[in-house]
Amino acid sequence: MEIDLFCELASPPGRPQGADGLFQDLIDVARAADRLGFGTLWLPEHHFLGDYSAASAPDILLGALAQATERLKLGFGVLPLPIHDPIRIAERLATLDALSGGRIMWGVGRGVTTTELEGFGAEPSSSREIFLENFADLQLLLESGSFERAGAVYSLNPRPSARLKDGWVAAVSPETFDLAAE
């Protein structure tokens, strides 16, 4: 049996702690999980939510965890696609995959809070459409390692490995369940 961890990076009530303390605790937890044989440590991505979550840059945190661990898989759980450029996501996944020796897992989702969407200038009513477009683009980027724009072909470096072709989709609506099943 494999047991995974999901770390929200919240500041617990009655235990005010700055980001530096939360991040050091995360590294300590990851090292212990690695030593004890846990499967994957997943990090979310949230913005502008106060003490709820300090996980605004999970790619940077996962890079630190990749260097602090040896076997523990490390996962994005989940990347909110309506607020991200799929090219940058593919580049970061490929970089982290190389940095971690192939231990990066990824999941994507449509939903973040209205506060987060609006904070990034995304219209909440358009989040599904943007998610679908960005998800299709991300899949193509991870499979091909390149894209075309205005007649020019651009290649990602590092090139995404075959390990990255499969990911997870967070779903709470019937339409997204169908997408995840595909």
Language-model segments: what does each one mean?
Residues M1-A68, K73, K165:
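N-terminal beta1-alpha1-beta2 module of alpha/beta enzyme domains
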Residues E8-A10, H46, L79-L81, G109-T113, ...:
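Active-site beta-loop-alpha junctions enriched in small/polar residues
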Residues P13-Q17, P80, E118, A122:
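Short coil/turn segments at secondary-structure junctions
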Residues L43, A57, L79-L81, D85, ...:
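Hydrophobic alpha-helix-in-membranes signature
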Residues L49-S53, L79-D85, E123-P124:
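Glycine-rich "substrate-gating" loop/helix at the edge of Rossmann-like oxidoreductase active sites
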Residues D51, A64, F76, V108-V112, ...:
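Gly/Ser/Thr-rich helix-start
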Residues D85-E182:
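Internal, glycine-rich beta/alpha segment that forms the wall or movable "lid"
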